[in-house]
Structure formats: structure tokens, C-alpha cells
UniProtKB/Swiss-Prot annotation:
Family statement drawn from the similarity comment of this UniProt entry: Belongs to the eukaryotic ribosomal protein eL8 family.
A GO molecular-function annotation: RNA binding
Gene Ontology BP terms: maturation of LSU-rRNA
CC per GO annotation: cytosolic large ribosomal subunit
Protein name: Large ribosomal subunit protein eL8
Length: 271
């Protein structure tokens, strides 16, 4: 018999597949060398044990008293039922209209303290020199302060009344919207007693009133008055019906939800 020679198979070398162009290369984990002499101990964060980890401790900060008071007031105004005469001060003039009003009031700011001193000094010097000046007409300026504004409203001389929303105590101005409506004077509630204070060179101001304006500003004032009347004077009946507050906190809401869930479970068990 003739023996066949075994055929040698060709060994084809394995080709490496090219990696994907956007594939991230695998990170090679480097094993940390641990010294066996050091024992691993679990940290105990109890009192007098390990140093505490860094946490956000702002909840436990003892804040200044004025900050605590304003936070308590904000929460109380949400929780308690607020009657409509006080709640109306939460509904302020919209931002674009408020900016237009402030722009108008800027033109009729009263004279600053330095200018007043200089004017009175010049007047006194003229009087000492024997020069008598005729009495000058009062300039078209803002009327400031609650007494002056109320007087202007009662005499129906005020063309526009602007009230701050955050007067404290609120009793100073709580009756003013009703008085303005009764006398037919347009009024609006604007954000910030400090904002009104800047107009009259004071820290804060409860309210200001416009009595007279220049002829050039009369068309702009008429447009503003029309918008303000629509938002405040004409909506007075609607405003005086709306109570404020009465909102529960997250803890109370969670407690009520838990009770409702328990009631539903009991009803299902009975059925």
C-alpha cells in the first residue's frame, strides 16, 4: 500500500480589528497598593468620635433677628387667611408700566437738600441787601408723605397717586385705595417703599402724588392713567372679594395625604 503524505494546513495569522474612530479607550484600572500593616477601620461619626464630614449647615445657622423676622412674616402671610383690604397690596403694577410711571415721576422730583439750602441762602442775601423779590409760583413737584397725599386726594387735586406695597405698619395706607376710588382719583400700588424714597431723597416713602404736569407730558400721563384705572380703580369690586394666604406647608400637606391614604385603605378593606 502507498501511504499518503499528510497535507500541511496553512496557518493564517489573526488580524486585529481597527477600533471605532469615536470609541473611548478603556481605562486601565491601576490596583492600589495596600500596606497590610495598616488596618481598615470604619469611621464612627458619633459625638466625640471621628471628625465630621463637611455638610451644608446653613439650616442650623443662627441668622440675625431682622432676617428671622422677615422669614417668619413671609411664612405667616402664606399660612394665615389675609383679608382683602390687606391682600390687595400683593397685587402690584406690572413691570413695564411701573418703569414708565417711574420715568414720569423722575421729571417732577422735589429739589434736593443742597439746592434748597443754596436757594434759601440766596433769598436771604437778597433780602438783607434790600432787594424784594416777588413771590414765585410753586413748581410742579411730587407731593410726598401720607398727610400731604390724603389732603390732595380729599381736595381732588391729585392726578395720580402711587402707593408702596411694603409699608410697615400697613395701617398707614390700608384705607388709601378706598379713599382714592371714592374721590375718583386714579391710584396704583407699586413695588418698593425704598424705590419711592429715592424720588424724594429719603430712605423710604409710603406714597407720592402728582398734582400738576407740564403740557408736553399730558398725553403720556393720560395713557398711564387709562392703564392704571383699568388695573386698579375699575377692578376694585373684584379686588375686595379676594382673600389671601391659607396655603399649607409641605409637612401639613404630607400629613393630610397620609391620612387620606389610610382612609382609602380602610374603605378597601371594608369592601
Amino acid at each position: 500500500m502507498v501511504t499518503k503524505k499528510p497535507v500541511k494546513k496553512k496557518v493564517v495569522p489573526k488580524q486585529k480589528v481597527a477600533p471605532a474612530p469615536l470609541a473611548k479607550p478603556k481605562k486601565v484600572e491601576v490596583k492600589k497598593v495596600v500596606n497590610p500593616l495598616f488596618e481598615k477601620r470604619v469611621k464612627n461619626y458619633g459625638i466625640g468620635q471621628n471628625v465630621q464630614p463637611k455638610r451644608d449647615l446653613s439650616r442650623f445657622v443662627k441668622w440675625p433677628k431682622y432676617i428671622r423676622i422677615q422669614r417668619h412674616r413671609a411664612i405667616l402671610q402664606k399660612r394665615l387667611k389675609i383679608p382683602p383690604p390687606i391682600n390687595q397690596f400683593t397685587q402690584t403694577l406690572d413691570k413695564p408700566t411701573a418703569q414708565q410711571v417711574m420715568k414720569m415721576l423722575e421729571k417732577y422730583r422735589p429739589e434736593n437738600p443742597i439746592a434748597r439750602v443754596q436757594r434759601l441762602k440766596a433769598k436771604a442775601e437778597a433780602k438783607a441787601a434790600g432787594k424784594e423779590e416777588p413771590p414765585s409760583k410753586r413748581a410742579n413737584q411730587l407731593r410726598q408723605g401720607i398727610n400731604s397725599v390724603v389732603k390732595m386726594v380729599e381736595q381732588k387735586k391729585a392726578q395720580l397717586v402711587i402707593i408702596a406695597h411694603d409699608v410697615d405698619p400697613i395701617e398707614l395706607v390700608v384705607y388709601l385705595p378706598a379713599l382714592c376710588r371714592k374721590m375718583g382719583v386714579p391710584y396704583c400700588i407699586i413695588k418698593g417703599k425704598a424705590r419711592l424714597g429715592t424720588l424724594v431723597y429719603r430712605k423710604t416713602c409710603t406714597c407720592v402724588a402728582l398734582t400738576q404736569v407740564e403740557n408736553a407730558d399730558k398725553p403720556n400721563l393720560a395713557k398711564l392713567v387709562e392703564t392704571i384705572k383699568t388695573n386698579f380703580n375699575d377692578r376694585f369690586d373684584d379686588i375686595r372679594r379676594h382673600w389671601g394666604g391659607g396655603l399649607l406647608g409641605p409637612k401639613s400637606m404630607a400629613r393630610l395625604a397620609k391620612l387620606e391614604k389610610a382612609k382609602k385603605r380602610e374603605m378597601l378593606q371594608k369592601n
